[in-house]
Amino acid sequence: MSRVCQVTGKRPVSGNNRSHALNATKRRFLPNLHSHRFWVESEKRFVTLRVSAKGMRVIDKKGIESVLADLRARGEKY
């Protein structure tokens, strides 16, 4: 399963670990993803989305119906 938020599109980014001596080694910063079930009142069913913490805040703000409409417009399955 890919590490991509279905709502915001956040994905892993690369950067460096830095020691006290400032040696750089490559690492990945992963998004804070969770599989979460949302109740969709209009469809009378639960929808499971893999969303980041920010994605959950977007759903709280815009509403699950609006977010699902955006996903449908992008052609993404949920």
From Swiss-Prot:
Gene3D superfamilies xrefs: Ribosomal protein L28/L24
Membrane found in the keyword field: no
GO terms for biological process, alphabetical: translation
Domain of life: Bacteria
MF terms in GO: structural constituent of ribosome
GO cellular component annotations of the record: cytosolic large ribosomal subunit
Alphabetical UniProt keywords: Ribonucleoprotein, Ribosomal protein
Annotated family: Belongs to the bacterial ribosomal protein bL28 family.
PANTHER family with a match to the protein in the record: 39S RIBOSOMAL PROTEIN L28, MITOCHONDRIAL, LARGE RIBOSOMAL SUBUNIT PROTEIN BL28M
Protein name, entry field: Large ribosomal subunit protein bL28
Native source species: Proteus mirabilis (strain HI4320)
Source organism phylogeny: Bacteria, Pseudomonadati, Pseudomonadota, Gammaproteobacteria, Enterobacterales
